[in-house]
């Protein structure tokens, strides 16, 4: 019960603080896996109820699931013929720049999570 409440608190904090988009997946348990850890999509082990971050996505796991949230908004409506999207992993943001002149930003009409 404590683990479930911890994961719920983590999820609620991420959603409220950042208006994040989250996904919840069932936790797979493998034969050589200890019961007090979980494995991410890259095969890395993490302790239960301990958050980790990779590629601007924050994750945590409990005994039954892995919850991951991201708050990086992506450009949706922009001039796709003349502009390129650049991702900035250091601050989890995107910018849209002119393809011929990358120093010039392009107008973005809408963003999505």
UniProtKB/Swiss-Prot annotation:
Main location: secreted
Keywords, alphabetical: Disulfide bond, Secreted, Signal
InterPro entries, per database record: PSP94
Cysteine disulfide links: 22-69, 38-61, 56-92, 59-68, 83-106
UniProt-annotated location(s): Secreted
Signal peptide feature range: 1-20
Pfam families for this protein: PSP94
KW Disulfide bond (keyword) present: yes
CC per GO annotation: extracellular region
Keyword Oxidoreductase included in the entry's annotation: no
Oligomer status and interactors: Homodimer; Interacts with PI16.
Membership in a protein family: Belongs to the beta-microseminoprotein family.
The protein's name in its UniProt record: Beta-microseminoprotein
Species annotation: Mus musculus
Top-level taxonomy: Eukaryota, Metazoa, Chordata, Craniata, Vertebrata
């Amino acid at each position: 019960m404590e683990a479930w409440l911890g994961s719920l608190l983590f999820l609620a904090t991420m959603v409220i603080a950042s208006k994040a988009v989250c996904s919840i997946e069932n936790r797979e348990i493998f034969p050589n896996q200890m019961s007090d850890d979980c494995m991410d999509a890259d095969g890395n082990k993490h302790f239960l109820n301990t958050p980790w971050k990779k590629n601007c996505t924050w994750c945590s796991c409990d005994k039954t699931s892995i919850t991951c949230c991201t708050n990086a908004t992506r450009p949706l409506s922009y001039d796709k013929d003349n502009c390129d999207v650049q991702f900035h992993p250091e601050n989890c943001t995107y910018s849209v720049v002119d393809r011929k002149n990358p120093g010039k930003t392009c107008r973005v009409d809408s963003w999505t999570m």
